[in-house]
From Swiss-Prot:
Residues 250-466, 692-963, 999-1099, 1141-1169, 1292-1360 form a coiled coil. Residues 18-69 form the FHA domain. It comes from Homo sapiens (Human). Testis (at protein level). Residues 1397-1412 have a biased composition (Low complexity). Residues 659-672, 955-973, 1086-1099, 1382-1396 have a biased composition (Basic and acidic residues). This is Forkhead-associated domain-containing protein 1. Residues 106-133, 652-688, 955-976, 1086-1110, 1372-1412 are annotated as: Disordered. Transmembrane segments: none annotated. It is found in: Cell projection, Cilium, Flagellum. GO terms for cellular component: sperm flagellum.
Length: 1412
């Protein structure tokens, strides 16, 4: 069954087990920072015919169908969407010919059903337990975790995008369920944790889960209220997630403690096995003691026999007996020492057993404490459940504020108690860990002491074995060598003569003196040593040359590769600074395969190039943001600078042409005005004066224009200087950065060279010391081999008998090795061998009697031979002395090796310290480079800002120059003062603009920092809001849509009302037109009256006043119009007609009224809320009416105080009556009713919102819950202040919650950092453990080699001792020929001793077999 992973890049074929990660050896390599080296594994389960995904506890985890998974195994189905890490490609699982397997989770209910009974929430919890999933070797699943696909039923229908869990939800699912009944909607809050549900909790109805809380929400709630409810629910989720994190931490601690308990139990089992071994050792020691007692008895009997025989023996026999007595006493002393050692070891064993019992008790106590801690954790889990139930009760009783507060206080107290308990528990856990560590260290110390004691016992046993073997071989060889001595002496002489001929040649070395054996041996040793040394030197030199040549070739190849790659990088950096090319070069350099001494330099160069590449990418991004394409950097820079200069020159040319055009326009205007004045004043006398005045003004204007041009040139020069200074500073800083980078690169290279030199020196010194040690060992081995060869040559003289004995000894050794395997078979074989040995002793006794007879006959002929034997004994003594010297040399060599190891360790420590120092320096250099890059980027940003400000200044100057030819005043009274004031005003304006620019630059710099901080806060708020929005249900979205529909309906109603208002305004305009027609009729009638009254000269002033009164009295009707243009016309008419007293004051008041009206209109336009539009319209109309009435009254009062008031009152009364009749009935009824309804709705909404906010946020002092409908102005101001105070309280509460969230996020970051440090420490610990294991293996091998060398030396000593004893036996035979019968009896006793010694030896051989 083939399976593929489908992605945007193609298809990837899955094997039975495919590894995924960043490591090169993984099957699917994903090069992204979110993925670990060994991220996950997809394995095929043949039992269930499905694929299983296993996450290796990665940092960012994996996502299966947008569900976060970490350290969990998940069964996959065709069509599952996988994503490794938080950001990366998505893969779809495609299986060819999938098996017809019915997935049980496909039968479950759909995840988003309609209205269901309350038991529907428990259905997912009753899902069957997950099937057994085979995990990868070395990876065990977490104990309290389940897979996403098994813990929750999968729907057959594809889920909508809104149901998927957001990325920021942190392993938790959060959902709202809204009942669709006629009751008010209930928001049910449900927390489920897909990664923590255990099978027990599923079977028992999830006792650890918190019951869902319900919040009753009215149907008329606004969207803001719902958002605030969602925020509060999210905060409660975060609060409960803290408890879940703490419980996780406790579970991890419990698992660690369980592992430690398991390790301790294993150690206890090992101690029990060691006890059994110690019991066996004690039994064997008892058997040895019994054998030693029997031997002592035999020795005493032998002493008594020897004392009886000593009377008739000669001096030679006395000497031999005394020597044997001394040997026996030494054996006794050794036996006593063995007994003492046995007693000491038994005491030590008993003390160790006591210590082990005490530690077992400590382990039991720790187990009890662990169980107690588990029970406490269970109690705390129950307490958490109780807390969850209390939270649900609190949510149900939101309306009852008093009970809610009391419960919250109780919860806070319990939380504090829980926190204190948790802290105490953590302290106790730390103490327990410390005690466990102490116990582990003590056990390790005890185990070491036991090992050392066992080694000492083994050495003692080996010594005793060797001595017993020596005794046996002495007895056997004494009987055999007596017979074959004659042949050996002849062969020795012949062999000696041949050796002399071979060494010295045919010529005699010393004609007068004979060649001694010592001279001959020295000559042979010299020749052999010279030959061996020559061969060894040749061999070592060949090896060294080969190794050095291979290493040099490898290093040269690696250095050449690195040089070529570095040359290409340097060429890329010199030719073009494109990030794409540099990235290619860095990738090529990274994929170079280099040996370890050059790899460190490669890493450092890669770090430097990556930093330069990141800086280059940031620069290119900035250039792209500015609109410059960074394809070819050199050309683009040139084009950019040329474009900037072209833009600057074009701006200059445009400014100059604008100025010339403005000057020409001014001249044209002046000419037109002059012509018009000349035409108007043809018949007047002041024509010449006006022309002179115009010429003066032209000259002044030209002077002002020239001065402005000069100032502009100065400003442009200053700008150019500033740009040059900035460019210079930027270039200097870039050069500094480059120099710093080069210096850092040189330093890094120097450091790498130093490291390489130190490594080479260390390696050479270590190799030299190893060679010296090997040469010393080999020379000593050669000496030993020479001695062995010499001895074998001497042994070959004693021909077939010695070979026969050796064969027998080998057979006996093989038999003893076989006896070690099975103790019972050995005992039987030893009995058979004892019987055989008794028979052999009889035969040997007969042979000895015959040999003694033969020796008596050949005593006289072999006197010379005895002298030769003595010389041989002397030589043997000398060889023994040489062996002792070799032993001392071996000890010295061992000491040297130990010292060398210590030196190597010290050098390694120094290397590590130097490495740490170099790494720290490199990190400091990297930080400095980052800081330089940041300063460069900030300076470039400042440059951009300065250029933008300069552009703004130029634009403002151009606008000011456009506005320079200001229109001249119409008044001809002060023509000379106006141009001076204008020029001074322009100068002041320029100065103010420059000051404003400087201040604006400072403010912009300060505001940019604030803007960056606000952007960060906005991004955080957006992320949180997106998380909360992602957790909304479909029903809440439906409610939001309904609210949107309501808002649209309200907007439509407002548009309808606006249309009605437009109709009303059209009606008002019609009425205004009618009023204008009436006014025109009145004016016509007034003109008629004037024509009639002109005839009467006496009544002119009265008629004038009447016309003024009528005009003034008609004006208020005109002022009640809505448009500002009509108002201005009425006031201008008044000003024209009332050109008498206080004309200027009236104009100023009109201007003030107009400015106030415009300001109010702007303020009303800024307010955009639809709820207050009607209110604004009404207030606007009221203000207009009041202002117009006040203005008209002031004009009437101030225009002419002498006018009669009766006429005003008579005309005003009918006008007011008309206005009230026309506007009161239509506007007041429609406008005031709408405004009142809108105000009531807004107050209701505000009161509901404030109540819900106060209840949700536990704000006690919400005192603004009072309607402002029937309150006076003072009371309204008080209520407004209270509401402002409530808003401040809400704002403070929200800021507190934000701060709490920030602190929690910081804690989480700290925890993540600690986890990463633990992972790194684990990796380093594993490395150190592997190194320690390697060192232990090396030490063990060296110890074995030393033991083999020691055994060879001991064999040589044993053989020499045997030859000494043979020579002594020969002497005894020569002296004691007369007393043969007594000697035969003595030999029989010796044979009996040998049989007893063999039996003891077999027992000693059986002891190590028990151990092994």
């Amino acid at each position: 069954m083939k399976a593929y992973l489908k992605s945007a890049e193609g298809f990837f074929v899955l094997n039975k087990s495919t590894t995924i990660g960043r490591h090169e050896n993984s099957d699917l390599v994903l090069q992204s920072p979110d993925i670990d080296n060994h991220h996950a594994l997809i394995e095929y389960n043949e039992a269930e015919c499905s694929f299983v995904l296993q996450d290796f506890n990665s940092r960012n985890g994996t996502f299966v169908n947008e569900c976060h998974i970490q350290n969990v195994a998940v069964k996959l189905i065709p069509g599952d969407i996988l994503r490794f890490g938080s950001a990366g490609l998505t893969y779809e699982l495609v299986i060819e010919n999938p098996p017809p397997v019915s997935f049980p989770w496909m039968r479950g209910p759909a995840p988003w059903p309609g209205p269901q009974p309350p038991r529907a929430t428990q259905q997912p919890n009753q899902a069957p337990p997950p099937s057994h999933i085979p995990f990868h070797q070395g990876v065990q699943p977490a104990p309290m975790q389940r897979s996403w696909s098994q813990a929750f039923p999968r729907p057959t229908v594809v889920l909508p995008a809104s149901h998927r869990r957001p990325v920021s939800a942190n392993k938790e699912m959060f959902s709202f369920v809204v009942d669709d009944a006629r009751k008010p909607p209930v928001i049910k809050q449900v927390w489920t944790n897909a990664m923590k549900l255990s099978e027990k909790s599923v079977a028992e109805g999830i006792p650890g889960a918190v019951p869902p809380a319900e919040i009753y929400v009215e149907e008329d709630l606004a969207q803001q209220d719902k958002d605030e409810i969602i925020l509060l629910l999210g905060k409660e989720v975060s609060r409960l997630s803290d408890y879940e994190i703490e419980s996780k931490y406790k579970d991890v601690i419990i698992a660690n403690l369980q592992n430690e308990v398991a390790e301790l139990s294993q150690k206890v089992s090992e101690t029990t096995t060691s006890r059994q071994n110690e019991k066996e050792i004690s039994q064997k020691c008892q058997v040895l003691d019994e054998d030693i007692d029997a031997k002592q008895k035999e020795i005493q009997s032998l002493k008594s026999q020897i004392s009886a025989l000593q009377k008739g023996y000669s001096k030679v026999l006395c000497q031999t007996l005394s020597e044997r007595n001394s040997e026996i006493t030494s054996l006794k002393n050794e036996g006593e020492n063995l007994k003492r050692d046995n007693a000491i070891t038994s005491g030590m064993v008993s003390s160790l057993q006591k210590d082990i019992l005490a530690k077992d008790e400590q382990v039991q106590q720790l187990k009890e404490e662990v169980s107690h801690l588990k029970s406490q954790n269970k109690d705390k889990d129950h307490q958490l459940e109780a807390l969850g139930s209390r939270c649900s009760v609190l949510k149900e009783e939101l309306k009852q504020e008093d009970a809610h507060r009391e419960l919250r206080e109780a919860q806070e107290k319990e939380l504090k108690l829980c926190k204190t308990q948790i802290q105490d528990m953590e302290k106790e856990m730390k103490k327990l860990r410390a005690e466990l560590r102490k116990s582990c260290t003590e056990q390790s110390v005890i185990s070491r002491t036991l090992r050392e004691k066992s080694k000492v016992e083994e050495k003692l046993q080996e010594d005793s074995r060797r001595k017993l073997l020596q005794l046996q071989e002495m007895g056997n060889r004494e009987s055999v060598i007596k017979i074959n001595l004659e042949r050996a002496v002849g062969q020795l002489e012949h062999f000696r003569s041949q050796v002399i001929k071979a060494t010295y040649g045919r010529a005699k070395p010393f004609r007068d003196k004979p060649v001694t054996d010592q001279q001959l041996i020295e000559k042979i040793t010299q020749v052999t040593e010279d030959n061996i040394n020559f061969q060894q030197k040749k061999w070592t030199l060949q090896k060294e040359t080969q190794l050095s040549n291979s290493k040099q070739e490898e290093t040269t190849e690696n250095i050449e590769k690195l040089r070529t790659s570095l040359d290409s990088c340097q060429a890329c950096m010199k030719i073009s600074c494109c990030s794409h090319d540099l990235k290619k070069e860095v990738d090529l350099l990274q994929h170079l395969q280099v040996s370890p001494p050059v790899s460190g330099l490669q890493k450092v160069v890669l770090d430097v190039l990556r930093h330069a590449l990141s800086w280059l990418e940031e620069v290119e991004q900035l250039l792209r943001d500015l609109g410059i394409l960074p394809s070819s950097p050199n050309k683009d820079q040139v084009q950019q600078f040329s474009g900037n200069s072209a833009v600057f020159t074009a701006g200059k040319a445009a400014g100059a042409s604008g100025r010339e055009g403005e000057a020409e326009r001014g001249e044209a205007r002046a000419r037109g005005e002059a012509q018009s004045q000349n035409q108007a004043t043809d018949g007047r006398e002041g024509g010449k004066a006006l022309e002179e005045y115009i010429t003066q003004e032209r000259n002044r204007a030209k002077e002002t224009l020239e001065e402005e041009r000069k100032r502009m040139q100065e400003l442009e020069s200053l700008l150019a200087q500033q740009k040059k200074a900035l460019a210079k500073s930027i270039t200097q800083e870039k050069n500094r950065v480059k120099e710093a980078l080069e210096e850092e690169q040189t330093r890094v290279q120097e450091l790498e060279e130093r490291l390489a030199r130190q490594k080479e020196v260390l390696e050479s010194s270590i190799a030299h010391e190893k060679r010296k040690a090997k040469e010393a060992l080999e020379s000593e081995k050669r000496k030993v081999q020479d001695l062995e060869n010499h001895l074998t040559q001497q042994k070959e003289i004693s021909e077939s008998n010695i070979a026969y004995e050796k064969r027998k000894a080998k057979e006996a050794m093989e038999k003893e090795k076989k006896k070690v395997q099975d103790l019972e078979n050995r005992l039987t074989k030893q009995k058979e061998e004892l019987e055989l040995k008794e028979q052999k002793e009889d035969v040997l006794n007969n042979k000895l009697s015959d040999a003694l007879a033969m020796v008596e006959e050949t005593q006289k002929t072999k006197a010379t031979e005895s002298l030769k034997a003595e010389s041989l004994a002397l030589k043997l003594n000398e060889t023994l002395a040489e062996l002792e010297t070799t032993k001392t040399k071996m000890i010295m060599v061992e000491e040297r090796l130990i010292l060398q190891q210590k030196m190597v360790k010290a050098l390694q420590d120094e290397q590590e310290s130097q490495r740490h120092g170099f790494e720290e320096e490199i990190m400091e250099y990297k930080e400095q480079i980052k800081q330089h890059a940041q300063t460069i980027v900030s300076l470039e940003e400042k440059l951009q800002k300065v250029t933008q400000h300069h552009k703004k200044i130029e634009g403002e100057i151009a606008t000011l120059k456009d506005n320079d030819p200001a229109p001249k005043e119409e008044r001809p009274q002060d023509p000379l003062v106006a141009p001076m004031t204008e020029s001074s005003a322009k100068d002041m304006a320029y100065e103010h603009l420059i000051d404003d620019l400087l201040a604006a630059q400072k403010e912009i710099l300060s505001q940019q920092e604030v803007i960056m901080k606000l952007r960060k806060d906005l991004t955080e708020a957006h992320s949180r809001m997106s998380d909360l929005r992602g957790e909304l249900n479909e029903k809440q979205k439906m409610e939001l849509e309904q609210n949107v529909v309501l808002v649209q309906q309200q907007s439509k109603e407002l548009s309808v009302l606006k249309e009605k208002m437009a109709q009303m305004s059209s009606l008002v305009e019609k009425k205004d037109r009618e009023l204008k027609a009436l006014e025109e009729a009145l004016r016509a009638s007034q003109e008629k009256h004037r024509l009639q009254l002109n005839t009467e000269k006496e009544q002119k002033p009265r008629k004038k006043t009447q016309t003024c009164d009528t005009s003034v009295q008609i004006e208020p009707v005109h002022t009640e119009a809505f448009s500002s243009s009509q108002e201005q016309q009425s006031f201008s008419d008044l000003g024209v007609r009332c050109k008498g007293s206080r004309h200027e004051e009236v104009i100023q008041r009109q201007k003030k009224a107009l400015s106030e009206l415009r300001a109010r209109i702007k303020e009303l336009e800024k307010a955009r809320s639809p709820d207050h539009k009607d209110h604004q319209n009404e207030s606007f109309l009221d203000l207009k009416n009041l202002r117009m009435e006040n203005n008209v009254q002031k004009i009437l009062l101030d225009a002419k105080p002498d006018l009669p008031t009766l006429s005003r009152i008579e005309i005003l009364a009918p006008q007011n009556g008309l206005c009230n009749a026309r506007f009161g009935s239509a506007m007041e009824k429609s406008g005031k009713m709408d405004v009142a309804e809108a105000l009531e709705l807004s107050e209701k909404l505000y009161l509901d919102m404030s109540k819900t906010l106060g209840s949700l946020m536990n704000i006690k002092n919400m005192s603004g819950h009072v309607s402002m409908k029937y309150l006076s102005r003072q009371e309204r101001e008080k209520v407004n202040q209270l509401r402002q105070r409530d808003l401040d309280l809400v704002f403070d509460k929200i800021t507190q919650l934000k701060n709490q969230l920030g602190r929690k996020e910081e804690l989480l970051r700290g925890y993540e950092k600690d986890v990463e440090q633990l992972r790194r420490s684990k990796v380093s610990i594993e490395m150190y453990q592997s190194q320690v294991a390697k060192l232990e293996d090396d030490i063990y091998k060296e110890a074995e080699e030393k033991a083999l060398l020691k055994e060879a030396l001991e064999r040589m000593e044993h053989q020499l001792c045997q030859e000494k004893r043979i020579n002594r036996a020969i002497r005894q035979q020569k002296v004691g020929t007369r007393k043969a019968s007594l000697k035969m009896d003595q030999e029989r006793e010796m044979l009996r001793k040998e049989t007893s010694s063999k039996s003891s030896q077999s027992l000693l051989h059986s002891k190590p077999s028990g151990k092994y």
